[in-house]
């Protein structure tokens, strides 16, 4: 009697374009909604409180980025290891990975809330608060830290739920949180006159709703099971999860480091321009939040390819892995060019959404957008390439790309060029870093495919 045929996984057989579309759209929308919490706060605070209130939300924003960085390290690392294990038919190891992740998330969430509460004053000073915005920044930060564990749960569990084959569920969770936040913001800010405190409370309530709904899904997992016996983490598996997730973590954590560095440079060198330190800080923070919407699209495409690449690499379908990368890189390039056009053509219109009727603020919007985003049309390629290496279990190459862009090029150049050219020098570091990371990405991926051909993996 012939053995029963194994049911084929869609990751191995379905059209690549359909798979990327299925996984990327919910993922991108999920991340967009995460960032929209802060953008909605900024819009309502800008209209209801003004530039000082906007500066306060900008100062606290790196906390959100750090939280999402931890979430992506744990969630993406778990999802990548799960996909590799499932591709190799290692079901028990996939179950262990998912179970470990729950414990890691709880521990990280408790740490974020407690540390954020205890060191709120130091965090606000480190993140570049001006003297006039200090108290508002502190009030806002002391509240939002209690929503960070739920932001962590929702951001990390989306990767696991996506790898489980249900990306639409994550989108529903995030939309619920965003709707709650958007409804409560005007009530607390305008109706109850609570200012930035009201914005923070609305954000936390929305994050609790979204994170709670994601936690409920753990009982509905299809491809893996959470087992109580495997909740206690082991060093080996935890290290493997972190190893696979560290590129996602560093991409986000370096984004936070860039923003903290630039916040301080905007405060210092912006004060020497006609814009002033508070306006420069507020506008830069707004630009970074709008940038995060574009960034979410790239993460959506990149994250969508991770389970495809991981499963097919584990199944030795190397032609399919290469085809997936090519399609992801093409999509990323098109999206990059589109956002570049928006940033260059409509900077004042974007600024008007946040603060209207202030010509100095709008002049700063136009200048910062056009200089800081000068090479943004190249941006998406480095993210698609880093995700490709992460998906096939090569974290060193995946890590090198974001590390070089931000830690080796952008931050040092911003510090050096600002000393030589002031305000504009700090802004010019970003387009230079985009060009360098684009060239590095091409070099690494071409070398990888040449290696595959030499080993006979590609037809």
Model-derived features with residue positions:
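Hydrophobic transmembrane alpha-helices of multi-pass small-molecule transporters
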Residues: 66, 181-185, 211-215, 293-296, ...
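Small-residue hotspots at the loop-to-helix junctions and early N-terminal turns
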Residues: 51-62, 137, 141, 200, ...
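Short alpha-helical transmembrane segments in multi-pass integral membrane proteins
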Residues: 1-27, 82-149, 191-246, 309-375, ...
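Helix-terminus/linker motif at the lipid-water interface of multi-pass membrane proteins
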Residues: 36-54, 124-131, 187-194, 253-287, ...
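Small-residue-rich hydrophobic transmembrane alpha-helices
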Residues: 54-114, 151-170, 263, 283-341, ...
């Amino acid at each position: 009697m012939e053995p029963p045929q194994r049911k084929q996984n869609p990751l191995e057989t379905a059209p690549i374009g359909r798979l990327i579309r299925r996984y990327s759209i919910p993922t991108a929308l999920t991340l967009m909604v995460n960032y929209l919490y802060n953008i909605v706060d900024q819009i309502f605070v800008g209209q209801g409180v003004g530039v000082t209130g906007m500066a306060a939300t900008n100062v606290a924003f790196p906390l959100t980025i750090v939280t999402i960085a931890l979430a992506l390290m744990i969630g993406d690392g778990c999802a990548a290891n799960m996909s590799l294990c499932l591709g190799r038919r290692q079901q028990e190891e996939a179950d262990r990975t998912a179970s470990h992740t729950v414990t890691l998330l709880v521990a990280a969430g408790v740490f974020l809330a407690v540390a954020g509460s205890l060191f709120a004053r130091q965090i606000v000073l480190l993140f570049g608060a001006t003297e006039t915005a200090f108290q508002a920044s502190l009030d806002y930060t002391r509240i939002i830290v209690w929503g960070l564990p739920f932001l962590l749960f929702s951001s990390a569990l989306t990767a696991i739920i996506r790898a489980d084959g249900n990306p639409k569920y994550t989108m529903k969770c995030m939309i619920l949180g965003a709707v709650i936040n958007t409804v409560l913001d005007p009530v607390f800010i305008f109706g109850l006159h609570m200012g930035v405190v009201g914005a923070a409370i609305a954000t936390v309530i929305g994050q609790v709703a979204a994170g709670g709904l994601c936690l409920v899904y753990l009982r509905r997992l299809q491809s893996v099971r959470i087992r109580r016996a495997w909740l206690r983490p082991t060093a080996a598996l935890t290290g493997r999860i972190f190893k696979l997730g560290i590129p996602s973590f560093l991409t986000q954590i370096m984004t936070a480091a860039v923003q903290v560095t630039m916040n301080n440079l905007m405060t210092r060198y912006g004060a020497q321009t006609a814009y002033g330190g508070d306006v420069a800080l507020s506008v830069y923070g707004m630009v970074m939040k709008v940038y995060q919407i574009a960034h979410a699209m790239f993460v959506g495409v990149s994250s969508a390819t991770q389970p495809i690449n991981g499963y097919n690499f584990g199944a030795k379908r190397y032609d399919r892995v290469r085809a997936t990368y090519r399609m992801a890189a093409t999509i990323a390039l098109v999206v990059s060019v589109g956002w570049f056009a928006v940033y260059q053509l409509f900077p004042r219109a974007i600024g008007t959404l946040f603060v209207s009727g202030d010509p100095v603020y709008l002049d700063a919007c136009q200048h910062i957008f056009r200089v800081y985003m000068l090479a943004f049309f190249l941006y998406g390629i480095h993210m698609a390439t880093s995700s490709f290496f992460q998906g096939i279990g090569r974290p060193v190459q995946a890590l090198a790309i974001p590390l070089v862009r931000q830690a080796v090029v952008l931050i040092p150049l911003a510090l050096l060029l600002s000393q030589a050219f002031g305000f504009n020098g700090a802004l010019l570091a970003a387009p230079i870093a985009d060009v360098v990371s684009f060239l590095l990405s091409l070099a690494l991926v071409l070398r990888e495919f040449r290696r595959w051909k030499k080993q006979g993996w590609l037809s």
